[in-house]
Curated annotation (Swiss-Prot):
Keywords in alphabetical order: Methyltransferase, S-adenosyl-L-methionine, Transferase, tRNA processing
Presence of keyword S-adenosyl-L-methionine: yes
Coiled coil: none
Organism the protein comes from: Actinobacillus pleuropneumoniae serotype 7 (strain AP76)
Residues reported to bind S-adenosyl-L-methionine: Q192, Y220, N225, E241, D301
Catalytic activity entry: uridine(54) in tRNA + S-adenosyl-L-methionine = 5-methyluridine(54) in tRNA + S-adenosyl-L-homocysteine + H(+); uridine(341) in tmRNA + S-adenosyl-L-methionine = 5-methyluridine(341) in tmRNA + S-adenosyl-L-homocysteine + H(+)
GO MF annotations in UniProt: rRNA binding; tRNA (uracil(54)-C5)-methyltransferase activity, S-adenosyl methionine-dependent; tRNA binding
Lineage of the species this protein comes from: Bacteria, Pseudomonadati, Pseudomonadota, Gammaproteobacteria, Pasteurellales
One Pfam family hit: tRNA_U5-meth_tr
Statement: the UniProt record of this protein carries the keyword Transferase: yes
Name listed for the protein in its UniProt record: tRNA/tmRNA (uracil-C(5))-methyltransferase
Catalytic site: C326, E360
Record-linked InterPro entries: MeTrfase_TrmA_AS, MeTrfase_TrmA_CS, SAM-dependent_MTases_sf, TrmA_MeTrfase, U5_MeTrfase_fam
GO cellular component term, pick one: cytosol
Amino acid sequence: MNLPIERYADLLAEKAKNLTALLVPFNPPELEVFESETSHFRMRAEFRVWHDTNEVGENELYHIMFDQETKQRYRVEQFPIANHLINKMMSSLLAEIKGNELLTRKLFQVDYLSTLSGEIAVSMLYHKKLNEEWQAEAAALKARLEHQGFKVQIIGRATKQKIALDRDYVEEVLPVDGRNLIYRQVENSFTQPNAKMNIKMLEWARSCTRHSSGDLLELYCGNGNFSIALAENFRQVLATEISKSSVQSAQYNIEQNGIDNLQIIRMSAEEFTQAMNGVREFNRLKGIDLKAYDCNTIFVDPPRAGLDQDTLNMVQAYERILYISCNPYTLAENLRQLSLTHRIERAALFDQFPYTHHVESGVWLIRK
């Protein structure tokens, strides 16, 4: 797999041109463009595993991917968009499990989750039930990889089954504006794929909100990626999340980073709106006085579909809106309504996914 590194600047310029054109109707300021590293920028990767027999009858294992156009599989020895740690682990893992029936039989996929801090989680997916024998072999594999210098976690997954030998997460450390922020990242949960671009996004969000007054509300905060970084800029932060594992990670991250003004609530945006408006009462809110919060800034990072109409109406009521988008077209659609009441103070492109058409962007909106 060869990357068109020599074309990176042109590809990024094309993304910036297209995003600028989408934002023109809303009279934005000049677009801030944040470029990625040109290789080894991705912190996670997933590969199917192909089983074959060589010319002398030995079983062989390969990482494979599928061509998006032809659907043909191709062998992956090295993966230049993934960080160096993943590439090193790819070859070491296959070398260590080759010929091991317990670890290779019905193994169909391997997922890698790595960090800038040097930790890596390897999730091995099987079409079979995993037993104590598998667990013993996996523990021996972990020990051999650790002997090679890897800080590794091994997780086995099968239908309705998950075995983590030690733990099912890695701990990332991100240097943000001169401070190291600690984030627990659970395997098979969402994390920002381009860690160094994530740092740029966090620093940009912090710079937008630096002189804020009042409190911040974040919808669907995940493991607290943004809310932890932004907490310093606000009196209090209230964040919602529906995933139980993400809430647990967020609570851990809050404690590890010494944040004392951030409250995570496990509920949906719709439920939170009902609670704020006094429509319903929730046991999950016992001990939390919503009236004590003065949330005049809201942070949203919606899925590709953008904000639904009800959430859009709710967001529009806030004085300041920080909107991170993974789909510029739905961002532009949402801005048709938001621009009636708010102006774009700042706009940015974050090249989270080089060499693809995917665009990550951010707008900082202030009420007119």
